[in-house]
């Protein structure tokens, strides 16, 4: 079947689009070549970086309490299994409880030793959220918590996860240090059977067992598994190496709460990477390292993050003024402004920018996440024009801030702002004015070789004592099963990743046929925005409704019914084709040379037009997507779903 898809992102001539500067085409060529040779490291030395450094194995670590599986126990059962105990998993658990399920109905599992997801694993110095904490930290209205700052540090974000778990008593229903390798649908029992393993917090041993669940939700995030680049010579390097997601305070000194890295005062430190993590960690390392060398493959645009302490008087007045539902309304106000390329405030609630930060002054980001205007014929020209003004201001700021002209030139971002997730910080560019800080521009090639002494680049050796890998996270496949690192087999043994190989097919972006009672929030065929917590919350709200209503459809008189719900073939085809019809909303991302928002990254590198279109998010943006789900629920008919049950 051929799907109309015009303009076709795969066929856009990059050179035909007005460029912000000539270097766009140069970086496109360099970065594409570099990405082609990028691999994940197979080094035995770096494989150790995947281990959890925060468990209580050395006596000075702290892990959250959870449920231990006795070695004699072989099976565990639950009505609803939630994979993931970060903000996503917690939101699903809370929304399920609010929809009427009991605490005993829910079981959460996570490979980490505590709650928090990415905020459990990431504890590097300088860590903070880059989305306003008043909209990013979930369930503020329900918990009554007031964030300390507009953008809070990582320790507070992790603490908030613990706060949510404590309020809803989720510790008693969570298995930490637990991984699931296989998830198999049992048609006869109308259950998912999970093969699980829980590691011992005090030893290297693990206990294997089975979890049976009526429903399963893959709520694991994408920012927990370190992306380790292939670096020839890494095993020969005499110094120390670690990834930012597994920070080694034993080597640097300090702790997550007090990052006084006094052991680096005489050290020569190298940082590989200049993405979102590096932007936060580089200024902190510069405060303590004897020498700091930053190896940059491609520059990133860093906007000013105007952080400040929360004014509690303002907080109370703002909540009283907006009333119940204030956090969701603030989230939706944020979503509206980051996609408002025409600067049209069509609704009363959107006339005032509530968040007022670098994000809400960045409407060209709609090129990456979709929006109400993306499907209009002149959108590509419009978004380029809007972004050119932003880029012009950013370049002027860099040139006026960084003293050395050559360094300033190397830091200039030469791609459109929507191509990579933007960064925001106070003081990143000023760091390069310090005499002991040096920027090494690899012109798109990246670091390709290590020696015993350090980094070898263009025949020159940079001697180092410590190499910090700020190389991001291994997002992996776009298939929900692969991202969860679980082999998922549905009806008749069908593998989910095999179905995804032909291109995703979903209903509302959260479920797929032949995999009944399975839900997976994600980006393909679903609404997306910069605030991932909001995305998780809307998905949790929708999935909780579906599961609750599925039970409500059970005929009276059934005791302990087994419910089976999945989309009909017609409904799945319809939603998939509706997504495909809007995929041209992301045509502007074809211009991008790199980043998680490129056509290639979102489609797994597919050159097939229809398959590429199937991988795209909902093109009309998050507000449109949420409205469709709300109207569907309001009807109350569960249209498009097949519901069956059996009981006694």
UniProtKB/Swiss-Prot annotation:
Pathway: Secondary metabolite biosynthesis; terpenoid biosynthesis
Cofactor or coenzyme needed: FAD
GO terms of molecular function: oxidoreductase activity
Binding site for FAD: 118-121, 130-131, 136
Gene disruption: observed consequences: Impairs the synthesis of terretonin but accumulates preterrenoid.
Pfam families reported for this sequence: Pyr_redox_2
Key word Oxidoreductase present: yes
Coiled coil: none
Record EC number: 1.14.13.-
Job of this protein: FAD-binding monooxygenase; part of the gene cluster that mediates the biosynthesis of terretonin, a fungal meroterpenoid that acts as a mycotoxin. The first step of the pathway is the synthesis of 3,5-dimethylorsellinic acid (DMOA) by the polyketide synthase trt4. DMOA is then prenylated into farnesyl-DMOA by the polyprenyl transferase trt2. Methylation by the methyltransferase trt5 then leads to farnesyl-DMOA methyl ester which is further subject to epoxidation by the FAD-dependent monooxygenase trt8 to yield epoxyfarnesyl-DMOA methyl ester.
Annotated family: Belongs to the FAD-binding monooxygenase family.
Protein name (Swiss-Prot/TrEMBL): FAD-binding monooxygenase trt3
């Amino acid at each position: 079947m051929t799907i109309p898809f015009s303009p076709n992102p795969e066929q856009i001539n990059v050179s035909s689009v007005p460029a912000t500067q000539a270097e766009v085409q140069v970086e496109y060529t360099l970065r594409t070549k570099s990405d082609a040779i990028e691999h994940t490291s197979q080094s035995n030395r770096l494989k150790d970086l995947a281990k959890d450094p925060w468990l209580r194995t050395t006596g000075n670590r702290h892990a959250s309490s959870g449920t231990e599986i006795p070695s004699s126990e072989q099976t565990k059962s639950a009505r609803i299994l939630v994979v993931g105990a970060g903000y996503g998993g917690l939101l699903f658990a809370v929304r399920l409880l609010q929809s009427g399920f009991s605490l005993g109905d829910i079981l959460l599992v996570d490979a980490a030793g505590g709650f928090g997801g990415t905020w459990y694993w990431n504890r590097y110095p300088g860590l903070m959220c880059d989305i306003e904490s008043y909209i990013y930290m979930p369930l503020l209205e329900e918990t009554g918590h007031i964030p300390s700052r507009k953008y809070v540090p990582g320790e507070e974000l992790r603490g908030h996860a613990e706060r949510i778990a404590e309020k809803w008593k989720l510790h008693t229903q969570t298995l930490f240090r637990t991984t699931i390798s296989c998830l198999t649908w049992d048609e006869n029992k109308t259950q998912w059977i999970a093969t699980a393993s829980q590691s011992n917090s005090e030893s290297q041993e693990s206990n294997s067992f089975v979890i049976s669940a009526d429903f399963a939700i893959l709520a694991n995030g994408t920012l927990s598994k370190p992306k380790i680049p292939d670096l020839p010579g890494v095993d020969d390097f005499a110094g120390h190496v670690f990834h930012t997601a597994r920070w080694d305070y034993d080597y640097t000194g300090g702790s997550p709460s007090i990052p006084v890295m006094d052991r680096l005062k005489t050290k020569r430190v190298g940082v590989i990477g200049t993405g979102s993590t590096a932007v936060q960690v580089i200024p902190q390392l510069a405060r303590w390292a004897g020498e700091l060398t930053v190896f940059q493959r491609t520059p990133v645009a860093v906007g000013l993050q105007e952080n400040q302490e929360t004014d509690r008087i303002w907080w109370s007045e703002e909540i009283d003024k907006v009333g119940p539902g204030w956090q969701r309304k603030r989230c939706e106000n944020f979503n509206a402004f980051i996609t408002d390329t025409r600067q049209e405030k069509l609704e009363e609630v959107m006339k005032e920018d509530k968040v007022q930060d670098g994000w809400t002054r960045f409407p060209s980001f709609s090129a990456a996440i979709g929006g109400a205007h993306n499907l209009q014929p002149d959108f590509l020209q419009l978004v380029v024009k809007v972004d050119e003004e932003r880029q012009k201001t950013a370049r002027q700021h860099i040139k006026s801030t960084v003293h050395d002209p050559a360094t300033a030139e190397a830091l200039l971002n030469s791609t459109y702002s929507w191509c990579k997730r933007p960064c925001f910080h106070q003081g990143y560019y000023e760091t390069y004015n310090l005499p002991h800080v040096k920027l090494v521009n690899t012109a798109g090639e990246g670091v390709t070789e290590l020696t015993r002494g350090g980094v070898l680049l263009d025949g020159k050796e940079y001697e180092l004592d410590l190499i910090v890998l700020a190389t991001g996270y291994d997002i992996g496949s776009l298939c929900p099963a692969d991202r969860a690192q679980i082999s998922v087999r549905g009806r008749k043994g069908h593998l989910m990743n095999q179905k995804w190989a032909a291109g995703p097919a979903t209903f509302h972006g959260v479920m797929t046929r032949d995999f009944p009672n399975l839900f997976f929030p994600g980006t393909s065929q679903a609404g997306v925005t910069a605030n991932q917590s909001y995305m998780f919350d809307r998905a949790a709200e929708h999935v909780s409704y579906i599961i609750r209503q599925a039970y409500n459809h059970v005929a009276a008189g059934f005791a302990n019914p087994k419910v089976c719900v999945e989309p009909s073939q017609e409904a799945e085809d319809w939603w998939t084709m509706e997504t495909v019809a809007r995929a041209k909303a992301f045509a502007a991302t074809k211009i991008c040379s790199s980043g998680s928002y490129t056509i290639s990254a979102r489609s797994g590198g597919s050159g097939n037009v229809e398959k590429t279109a199937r991988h795209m998010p909902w093109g009309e943006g998050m507000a449109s997507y949420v409205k469709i789900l709300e109207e569907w629920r309001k009807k109350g008919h569960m249209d498009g779903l097949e519901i069956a049950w059996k009981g006694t």
